[in-house]
Amino acid sequence: MDDLSPDAFLAPYPDPIREAAHRLRAVVRRVVPDAIEAVRPGWHLVGYRVPAGRRSAYFGFVAPEPIHVHLGFEYGFLLEDPDRVLGGTTLRKVRFFTFRGPDEVDESLLAPFVRESARLAALTRAERLALVLDRDSESQEP
């Protein structure tokens, strides 16, 4: 993989998309200061990993497109979303927010989702499975 910088990766996008992407990157870096940021050119996104013991775990991404940019979460299906603000509910795992410009980026809304996404990613597979099973059993209780 090339060592493409996020700035270089985002440069071709329209100003509002690029600016929104930079704001989203800043939110992730503030909320998860030890996040490892890397451009994934094949996936057309900037991905984030969090250190988890002797490994690192993928937890989210900033994915620009010509008319909008997504802030997405790898284990989004496990995130609490009582107000149903996350998109991607028809997807298996990932959930996301969509922005058309920098003024739509609200750190106070996003920070809890970013923080929890990093925490979930750092769990072991067994711990995540236990969460799924707990939620399934809670939803089946009368």
Could you describe each region identified by the protein language model?
Residues 1-142:
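Charge-dense, helix-prone N-terminal extensions
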